[in-house]
């Protein structure tokens, strides 16, 4: 079998983490089998679909490394195909025009609710006579088109994740609406219908999507049969849950891929984490995967049925591993946009070699790329604010004299090197007859504003290169 899969997001919002995880599983399955990964944009909801969301979806997939082989195909450009399919079902007597009003449907639901029954359409317009239909039209009623569902029919399929699945037609809520009211005789085709037409037309072999689509699958199998088409294999993957076990939603904070990027997650770290959201590798001790490596191992036998809890701590850890193993030049490229977004100026001697030195200093401490913004602030501002501990340090006996001695020693240096910096510290310790700790703490506070921070000597060298060490030493002396 030639494997052909698709990811089919709706451009009614930015690329969601759940959609992205589904895309990951589709991509992995396609690559594992040497198949084709197709991008289809399901934009039949013309009122809510936006081109900016389409762009966000495509940009997000590319950023994650999920490049597609065919597409993007837009449902809004395929309406003729869907309308012909609706007409075919009408002509075959498998679908009909339903003129039931919204008020009548609401009354039906209320009556069923009062009896403790599940809401369902009662198929009242399935057998309208031409005269009845003409009367409804004369009343100005609009229609929807419904596909006939046999209540006695049992729908069975072997789900690649969940095993045997079985639904009865009576569980599907009555005859299914496949097109809503519009100006033409075939209506405006709806999601559950058009996805089947697309999957048939694109020869999709496997439909891989979230478990919240299981009820849709039962309905769609009936549509495949109505068109005499081959039914694809289905794999319904677990939902992504929050740590309390509820479906991950906007109430839990960030849910779109562009937000994760803005928060400082790397594409590699995020896609690695999504790969493990519901799938277990053969080697349970292996947690770091490239997409290509995961594709070699990916099977649905190792996809869990239970929901996958979204663990921020695990994502942070994975992300940090990718950051720590990214070469300095590449990491610099990743960090520059975050510095620019924070308004940091890269002028004043902050050239590429200087930036790479800064990245080398900070990289081991980064969990997210955004961490570099706060950690590096002292290297992009003319002055620093003293912390409470820093202020106390500068008031200690001997701090002012130590800083004055460092300034004097700096005047003898044409260029500060690591060796020269170490020599100055030794010279001040000896000359002032103080402990090295006092010198190091006083110097750190003067340069960084705090008693804690990145490597002191490397920080000093970076500040010296852009001419900020002496002004800060003088400012610290003034308040000591």
UniProtKB/Swiss-Prot annotation:
Q: Describe the reaction catalysed, as an equation.
A: tRNA(Glu) + L-glutamate + ATP = L-glutamyl-tRNA(Glu) + AMP + diphosphate
The record's principal subcellular location, in a coarse class, is cytoplasm
SUPFAM superfamilies in the record: An anticodon-binding domain of class I aminoacyl-tRNA synthetases, Nucleotidylyl transferase
Matching InterPro entries, A to Z? aa-tRNA-synth_I_cd-bd, aa-tRNA-synth_I_codon-bd_sub2, aa-tRNA-synth_I_CS, aa_tRNA-synth_I_cd-bd_sf, Glu-tRNA-ligase_bac/mito, Glu-tRNA-synth_I_codon-bd_sub1, Glu/Gln-tRNA-synth, Glu/Gln-tRNA-synth_Ib_cat-dom
Residues the record lists as binding ATP: 250
Q: What class of enzyme is it?
A: ligase
- Motif 'HIGH' region: where in chain: 9-19
Q: Which GO terms describe its cellular component?
A: cytosol
> Where's it found, cell-wise?
Cytoplasm
- Key word Cell wall biogenesis/degradation present in the record? no
EC number in record: 6.1.1.17
Motif extent ('KMSKS' region): 247-251
Biological processes annotated in GO: glutamyl-tRNA aminoacylation
| Source superkingdom | Bacteria
Alphabetically ordered keywords of this record:
Aminoacyl-tRNA synthetase, ATP-binding, Cytoplasm, Ligase, Nucleotide-binding, Protein biosynthesis
Specify whether Signal is a keyword of the entry.
Answer: no
**Which GO terms label this protein's molecular function in UniProt?**
ATP binding; glutamate-tRNA ligase activity; tRNA binding; zinc ion binding
Q: Which HAMAP family match?
A: Glu_tRNA_synth_type1 (MF_00022)
Q: What is this protein for, i.e. what is its function?
A: Catalyzes the attachment of glutamate to tRNA(Glu) in a two-step reaction: glutamate is first activated by ATP to form Glu-AMP and then transferred to the acceptor end of tRNA(Glu).
Q: Which family does it belong to?
A: Belongs to the class-I aminoacyl-tRNA synthetase family. Glutamate--tRNA ligase type 1 subfamily.
Assembly and interaction partners: Monomer.
Q: What is this protein called?
A: Glutamate--tRNA ligase
Source organism of this protein record: Nostoc sp. (strain PCC 7120 / SAG 25.82 / UTEX 2576)
Q: What is the lineage of its organism?
A: Bacteria, Bacillati, Cyanobacteriota, Cyanophyceae, Nostocales
Gene symbol here is gltX
